[in-house]
């Protein structure tokens, strides 16, 4: 029998959660991560599944995700501990045939449940499936320090925040030309913040929760992690620049346009217009 802990998706989750903890983005039980799988991914590991999978209803039906398996982080679980005990901190779940709930097929031992942000993740998965024709498979939420810090000092406006991050590091416009969506402060772990995040995910692969953290979407664990890493590096540069008295020069609009043309991307118009 093949051991599911050696599968590419469990090993990938271990690496992503460990890297995020080492970055300082996921203190205590902060942060959550979900990866959409295919039946073929989990088929070799049926022998590892729970004999009687627990069923948990969703707070709202999501028929677009019917019959879809995911690997998810658990509620109250520490990212730093995923590498030590994957089965206790991760779970493979599969949405039922009408999208009304899911079964926990593997992991989440001792009656653990998926992350409390699962509504936000699943709603965002639905929107990214539609926006990318199924290409995006990962949703990641973490507490990236410098991005959070900027939400206290910059106007929490998509165009303003995006333009500042683009100017903070040359690669940013290339990596996220679609800009950064921003919500008002909202109570986490609710359908309301999940719906608001998903609405922004229709247009942006990166969404900020002011004074809290960031949501990211991408086709792979590496791409999704790298998107946050890139934005966070720019935020770090901006924080350092502001602390040294502010910027004396920056990347101009004309240079941003040239950058987009060179790499074949279309920058968010509202941010470019500032």
Swiss-Prot record:
Q: Tell me if Cytoplasm is a UniProt keyword of this record.
A: yes
Where are the catalytic residues?
A: 117
SS bond list:
none
The EC number on file is: 4.1.2.19
- Where is this protein primarily located? cytoplasm
List the Pfam families.
Answer: Aldolase_II
InterPro entries attached here? Aldolase_class_II_sugar_metab, Aldolase_II/adducin_N, Aldolase_II/adducin_N_sf, Rhamnulose-1-P_Aldolase
Look up the record and name the cofactor or cofactors this protein needs: Zn(2+)
Give any GO molecular function from the UniProt entry: metal ion binding
Q: How is the cofactor bound?
A: Binds 1 zinc ion per subunit.
Task: Spell out the CDD domains in the cross-references.
Answer: Aldolase_II
- Provide the protein's localization: Cytoplasm
Asked whether the UniProt record includes Ribonucleoprotein among its keywords, one would answer: no
Instruction: Provide GO CC annotations from the record.
Output: cytosol
Q: Which reaction does it catalyse?
A: L-rhamnulose 1-phosphate = (S)-lactaldehyde + dihydroxyacetone phosphate
TM ranges are none
List this protein's GO terms for biological process. Answer: pentose catabolic process; rhamnose catabolic process
- Metabolic or biological pathway: Carbohydrate degradation; L-rhamnose degradation; glycerone phosphate from L-rhamnose: step 3/3
Task: Tell me which domain of life the UniProt entry assigns to the organism this sequence originates from.
Answer: Bacteria
Q: Which UniProt keywords apply?
A: Cytoplasm, Lyase, Metal-binding, Rhamnose metabolism, Zinc
Partners and quaternary state?
Answer: Homotetramer.
Q: Which family does it belong to?
A: Belongs to the aldolase class II family. RhaD subfamily.
- What is known about what this protein does? Catalyzes the reversible cleavage of L-rhamnulose-1-phosphate to dihydroxyacetone phosphate (DHAP) and L-lactaldehyde.
| PANTHER family associated with the record | FUCULOSE PHOSPHATE ALDOLASE (PTHR22789), RHAMNULOSE-1-PHOSPHATE ALDOLASE (PTHR22789:SF16)
| Name of the protein described by the UniProt record | Rhamnulose-1-phosphate aldolase
What is the protein's species of origin? Answer: Escherichia coli O7:K1 (strain IAI39 / ExPEC)
